[in-house]
């Protein structure tokens, strides 16, 4: 599972909402095709990993894949059956804050049909609407 090795603060502030569109990471930089996010949302490390596994199965040895998102925000949670209060809960899982326009995954070395199939399957594992974009 993806998570940072070290963080400056274990329990970060939670942002009220995700504003605007992605300024960085909005173009296909490494591969030939990319999976672009169309709506703002938190994407968990498990969802990223599930999508990555699907794409890598389609790519096998003939293609190459890049993951362009990383879960660097800790989400805290109180244990079950705990009363309210008593401070902030312990870090539970990690999420990546995804803005519209951000490229999530990139692939190269695959034909268009295989790429479409792989990206469609990966997009089903994610909680956001996405579209396939090409470098050209």
Curated annotation (Swiss-Prot):
SUPFAM superfamilies found in the cross-reference section: Ribosomal protein L16p/L10e (SSF54686)
Taking the record's annotation, the residue ranges forming a coiled coil are none
Pfam families for the chain: Ribosomal_L16
Query: What are its GO biological-process terms?
Result: translation
The entry's keywords? Ribonucleoprotein, Ribosomal protein, RNA-binding, rRNA-binding, tRNA-binding
**Gene Ontology MF term list:** rRNA binding; structural constituent of ribosome; tRNA binding
| Highest taxon of source | Bacteria
Q: Which InterPro entries does this UniProt record tie to the protein?
A: Ribosomal_uL16 (IPR047873), Ribosomal_uL16_bact-type (IPR000114), Ribosomal_uL16_CS (IPR020798), Ribosomal_uL16_dom (IPR016180), Ribosomal_uL16_sf (IPR036920)
Listed under GO cellular component are: cytosolic large ribosomal subunit
Xref: Gene3D superfamilies: Ribosomal protein L10e/L16
Instruction: Say which family it is in.
Output: Belongs to the universal ribosomal protein uL16 family.
- Kindly give the PANTHER family that the UniProt entry links to this protein: 50S/60S RIBOSOMAL PROTEIN L16, LARGE RIBOSOMAL SUBUNIT PROTEIN UL16M
How is this protein organized at the quaternary level?
Part of the 50S ribosomal subunit.
- Biological function: Binds 23S rRNA and is also seen to make contacts with the A and possibly P site tRNAs.
Q: Output this protein's name.
A: Large ribosomal subunit protein uL16
Q: Which organism is it from?
A: Elusimicrobium minutum (strain Pei191)
Q: Which classification does the entry list for the species?
A: Bacteria, Pseudomonadati, Elusimicrobiota, Elusimicrobia, Elusimicrobiales
